[in-house]
């Protein structure tokens, strides 16, 4: 499965790396890492509608994963020791507050949150690298305590390096800003990691609307809920002037804005498809960073 509008990535690696796809949603991370030559050996997603879309699109790409029943549901109920060995952990996890005790205790502060499950998997499975994605507000969440706790757990307690950056989808070819916090780390802390260079837009909102005249080159960030605001309303994110008429985007356009390939299918309702796209990741940005992770492992393989 390749991107609908290619961004020029997808170089082959010296080694076939394996990865797991946590909080998988509809598989944005799966597409990005598949495109750089990695193989998904385990995925976890609790939402039944998202699971339908994920299975529909990846059953042929990762048949062994589905055949071995390694497409799990609720991450909190997974036997983490039973997860297959893998090289890279990936996941876009929800932003949640930690214990009011602050971040003095580190790992224990994260109990009861979904980050705790990520940290537990890293502790038990000891992957070569991880790639985590979250909303940019995580960095300043709870006066910075949330991020400091995450940093302490990943570096001081689990022993990984940590590189982090606020990344816009529009800096990696896609026509929406969608700023997100990317966190990358390596078990071998001596591995240097260089952020990928920014790229010009691969296409604009005009291309998204099949060449029509559109009032913006870069679109609004896709969201979940809150649809239907007037085009002049600052809360509007789903309406555009297309050939001088107000048009609301559908999953057809949303799919392009997130970098999903043209043959990606939604076996769910249109409202569910839009919700799933709003919850997904910007594939071009993920793929650019995935490529750099693979290159770093290739050049510094343990």
Give the positions of each predicted feature:
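A local structural micro-motif
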Residues: 41, 162-163, 282
């Amino acid at each position: 499965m390749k991107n609908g509008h290619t961004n020029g990535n997808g170089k082959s690696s010296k080694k076939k790396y394996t990865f797991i796809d946590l909080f998988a949603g509809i598989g944005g991370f799966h597409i990005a890492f598949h495109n750089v030559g990695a193989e998904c050996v385990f995925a976890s997603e609790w939402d039944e509608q998202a699971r339908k879309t994920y299975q529909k699109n990846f059953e042929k790409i990762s048949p062994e994963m589905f055949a071995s029943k390694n497409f799990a549901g609720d991450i909190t109920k997974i036997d983490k020791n039973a997860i297959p060995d893998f090289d890279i952990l990936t996941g876009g996890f929800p932003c949640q507050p930690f214990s009011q005790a602050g971040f003095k205790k580190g790992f224990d502060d994260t109990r009861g949150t979904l980050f705790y499950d990520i940290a537990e998997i890293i502790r038990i499975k000891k992957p070569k690298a991880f790639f985590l994605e979250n909303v940019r507000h995580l960095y300043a969440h709870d006066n910075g305590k949330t991020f400091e706790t995450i940093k302490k757990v990943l570096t001081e307690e689990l022993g990984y390096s940590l590189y982090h950056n606020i990344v816009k989808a529009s800096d990696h070819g896609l026509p929406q800003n969608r700023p997100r916090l990317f966190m990358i780390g390596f078990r071998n802390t001596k591995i240097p990691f260089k952020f990928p260079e920014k790229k010009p837009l691969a296409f604009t909102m005009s291309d998204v609307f099949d060449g029509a005249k559109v009032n913006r080159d870069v679109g609004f960030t896709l969201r979940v809920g809150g649809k239907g605001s007037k085009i002049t309303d600052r809360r509007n994110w789903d309406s555009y002037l297309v050939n001088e008429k107000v048009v609301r985007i559908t999953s057809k356009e949303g799919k392009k804005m997130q970098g999903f390939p043209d043959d990606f299918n939604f076996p769910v309702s249109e409202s569910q498809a839009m919700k799933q796209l709003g919850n997904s990741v910007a594939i071009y940005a993920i793929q650019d960073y995935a490529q750099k992770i693979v290159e770093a492992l290739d050049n510094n393989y343990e």
